[in-house]
Amino acid sequence: MSGLGLQGVTVETVLQNPSLQAGSTLHGEISFKGGSSDKEINGLYLQLVTMAEVESGDHEFNQPLVLQEWLVNSRFLLPAHQAHSFPFSIQLPFETPITEVACRRNGARVWIQTHMDVDWGLDATDRDYLKVLPTPAMQMFLQAMQRCGFVLSTVDVEKGQLTARNFRSTIGCYQELEFVSSH
């Protein structure tokens, strides 16, 4: 389209604290600029996304899974070539998968997807990866497993829900930590 002299809307998100723990508040700013013509924007969204392993019959595959979505701004008119920005603060769910752990194979990825829904135009998107650190309780668990003679081998995220006596997961996935004996 830009070859025809039509420039689309652009969006860029800058995260102030991309390294954080689950349950913490993420701060940032979304900057965007209008294209070659005025555009009606249906909404500006932030999505917390992970790559989840999905089991289907005898097969497994990975697919992006939206864990939570926040509406930053609803319908508005974006004039041609005008630049705007919105600061934001969002709290990550306490069940957000951790990504920063020492292991042999870490398949956990978490990112913020910015999505601008452009009416009658190409939607503008941006992806920014997060470093989700273990909480103090998770750190204590990982250290206890190590003291018991186990090494964290594999970390991944699986689509599904966990249910226990007084708990039910809420984000549509769970994190799997696989340990092996260090002996």
Identify the meaning behind each predicted range:
Residues 1-183:
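C-terminal beta-sandwich interaction modules and adjacent acidic
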